[in-house]
Amino acid sequence: MSTLSPSVVISDDEPGYDLDLFCIPNHYAEDLEKVFIPHGLIMDRTERLARDVMKEMGGHHIVALCVLKGGYKFFADLLDYIKALNRNSDRSIPMTVDFIRLKSYCNDQSTGDIKVIGGDDLSTLTGKNVLIVEDIIDTGKTMQTLLSLVKQYSPKMVKVASLLVKRTSRSVGYRPDFVGFEIPDKFVVGYALDYNEHFRDLNHVCVISESGKAKYKA
């Protein structure tokens, strides 16, 4: 029987790191409070998640389904590690990729109104091991909606990998199968996570400042 994998738990009082200790684009210098998860730590954790995914799902054709846009960096890096394991294993499995785009945020709040605004023909998921890759689980409503949609196509197995899971009172209780980091209820950006389409070009996961929220508010 499969079990949910453990995660790196970041405490509520985690101070983070001073911005001056890292390379931060100058145009964001006044918009961030701190670096929360450095890029190197993200990569090391992602490498281990790839091993966990292959152990759990590596016996059958995997379709990796990326949730755009925020999931694309984590998706690309996770797949690089999975492909390395696959090509260096005595027993490799075929792997394909697909993409879907959802929208549930306005400014820093999850609206609860889930819109599917992209995606290919999901009938290709039938009979496959499906790995859904997401950047962050906040309330969990978005992922529950997507899981209901995916399961209509009768995949052999569905697992979810999320780089981040937020501890929040708004959560519906959903937890993905593979989690990189469990974080406090802060609005984070970077490593492709955005605030109204800004900050995707940061390498690190950072906490946005109040002035940053005001500057880029929709």
Swiss-Prot record:
Pfam families: Pribosyltran. It catalyses: IMP + diphosphate = hypoxanthine + 5-phospho-alpha-D-ribose 1-diphosphate; GMP + diphosphate = guanine + 5-phospho-alpha-D-ribose 1-diphosphate. InterPro entries: HGPRT (IPR050408), Hxn_phspho_trans (IPR005904), PRibTrfase_dom (IPR000836), PRTase-like (IPR029057). The active site is at D138. GO terms for molecular function: guanine phosphoribosyltransferase activity; hypoxanthine phosphoribosyltransferase activity; identical protein binding; magnesium ion binding; nucleotide binding. Pathway: Purine metabolism; IMP biosynthesis via salvage pathway; IMP from hypoxanthine: step 1/1. Keywords: Acetylation, Cytoplasm, Glycosyltransferase, Isopeptide bond, Magnesium, Metal-binding, Nucleotide-binding, Phosphoprotein, Purine salvage, Transferase, Ubl conjugation. Its cofactor is Mg(2+). The keyword Metal-binding applies. Its main location: cytoplasm. It is found in: Cytoplasm. Mg(2+) binds at D194. GO terms for cellular component: cytoplasm; cytosol. Its EC number is 2.4.2.8. Converts guanine to guanosine monophosphate, and hypoxanthine to inosine monophosphate. Transfers the 5-phosphoribosyl group from 5-phosphoribosylpyrophosphate onto the purine. Plays a central role in the generation of purine nucleotides through the purine salvage pathway. Homotetramer. Belongs to the purine/pyrimidine phosphoribosyltransferase family. This is Hypoxanthine-guanine phosphoribosyltransferase.
